[in-house]
Amino acid sequence: MLRIFCFVISWCLIAFAQPDLSGFVSILGAACGYGFFWYSLEPLKKPSLPLRTLFVSCFFWIFTIEGIHFSWMLSDQYIGKLIYLVWLTLITILSVLFSGFSCLLVAIVRQKRTAFLWSLPGVWVAIEMLRFYGIFSGMSFDYLGWPMTASAYGRQFGGFLGWAGQSFAVIAVNMSFYCLLLKKPHAKMLWVLTLLLPYTFGAIHYEYLKHAFQQDKRALRVAVVQPAHPPIRPKLKSPIVVWEQLLQLVSPIQQPIDLLIFPEVVVPFGKHRQVYPYESCAHLLSSFAPLPEGKAFLSNSDCATALSQHFQCPVIIGLERWVKKENVLYWYNSAEVISHKGISVGYDKRILVPGGEYIPGGKFGSLICRQLFPKYALGCKRLPGRRSGVVQVRGLPRIGITICYEETFGYRLQSYKRQGAELLVNLTNDGWYPESRLPKVHFLHGMLRNQEFGMPCVRACQTGVTAAVDSLGRILKILPYDTRETKAPSGVLETSLPLFNYKTLYGYCGDYPMILIAFCAVSYLGGGFLGYRLLAKKEIR
């Protein structure tokens, strides 16, 4: 009966240990949820389950939980029914990894190899790195330590060891709690210590920084546009209609501002393609700035330059970029920083979305897609960018730009800190998964970079979370976003963003300390098991 209770209570705790669902359940689940589950697999009193039954039970438990955690993927209005197969594949892979780890833990407990037990947090980090670095472009959502970030102190701990340190801590805490349930000596003290230590480090650092924050008076006045356009729009009567809607949004902006930001691919036709009739643009932009003479048609660059001249500040805008090489047309998802003189500095997205921006498996994957799923085959070759994401604009701090879910990969953004970035700007569009949890899930994963690197961030989104967040992870201003109950309205976020920056261990070292810990843990466990087997063979002889 106790095993069933632990199984059920652990499922409830971990299934809803999501910061977007419940902060309290997230913290509680991170403290004891997995410990209850492992106790249900291997309790103090026997009988023990056969290994196969153990794996199946574990797989069922985590498979149903991962299904809830990634339920936002099942919004198929724009993505299509193939997303169900992608969802099933993803949660199956994640479930197999966790089930294998749990069976390893139980096997060590059964053999009473306590010395090996404490290598397991590092082993889990090594396993989780497979998903961060190895599953397609990397799966950064819903890592095991994410529930810790429901607390400001838990998020601040990420400034020391990043996402991997948070996952390490959650595994260590729950193993200690499991040992407490097994009535192991010193387990209670160990559980309290592993539970409080990460939050204590985070709390001390956070409270110290709050005091230092007050001494820095620098701020940036930003205006962030949320057009709230759906991903697939009805056929336009005229190309200029998109700019007409955007200009209606920006015209009430209170001046002066230092930076005007638009979301990912906010207008079609790329940067330089001249598709907008001059007369139509002159009618719309006459109250903003003079337009270049001698052109029959204007481009997105011309329109953005006019806005930059009007507001006397740079404009960051998400655009497509097309490049023809050897008779092959390549597509880049880009961000352009355009000054009032028309000078542009660009960045191309580096981490592409599997399926949406590239087909995994190279030529073989593309062939299979064309044969079995022709509807989802991509019309042109899409490439990851190589241009630096850190841009320097006169009169502004260095800006680190990310597009879409790039902001959720801490190790990718470490180079931004080294290059002197003081502000993160993310351009995104979560509208591909309407009426789902994705906007908030994406936002909460992205804002972790603030405290990992000690930088504020601004997010510009079509229908997701458009927000300004300071370097301590405090939300300064946020626009309404798309949920199951409400549609995101169009609007402009205007705020003064404090530029307080600080150095962090994670910003300096990145994932390398945890990679070293993971390597040592795997080596110790592997070497220990090998030595144990060799010793057993000698005894048999």
Swiss-Prot record:
It is found in: Cell inner membrane. It is a multi-pass membrane protein. SUPFAM superfamilies: Carbon-nitrogen hydrolase. Its main location: membrane. InterPro entries: Apolipo_AcylTrfase, C-N_Hydrolase, C-N_Hydrolase_sf, LNT_N. GO terms for cellular component: plasma membrane. Residues 220-499 form the CN hydrolase domain. It is an enzyme of class 2 (transferase). Keywords: Acyltransferase, Cell inner membrane, Cell membrane, Membrane, Transferase, Transmembrane, Transmembrane helix. One of its GO terms (molecular function) is N-acyltransferase activity. The chain crosses the membrane at residues 21-41, 54-74, 82-102, 116-136, 157-177, 189-209, 512-532. GO terms for biological process: lipoprotein biosynthetic process. Its EC number is 2.3.1.269. Pathway: Protein modification; lipoprotein biosynthesis (N-acyl transfer). The active site is at E264 (proton acceptor), K349, C404 (nucleophile). Belongs to the CN hydrolase family. Apolipoprotein N-acyltransferase subfamily. Catalyzes the phospholipid dependent N-acylation of the N-terminal cysteine of apolipoprotein, the last step in lipoprotein maturation. HAMAP family: Lnt (MF_01148). This is Apolipoprotein N-acyltransferase. It comes from Chlamydia pneumoniae.
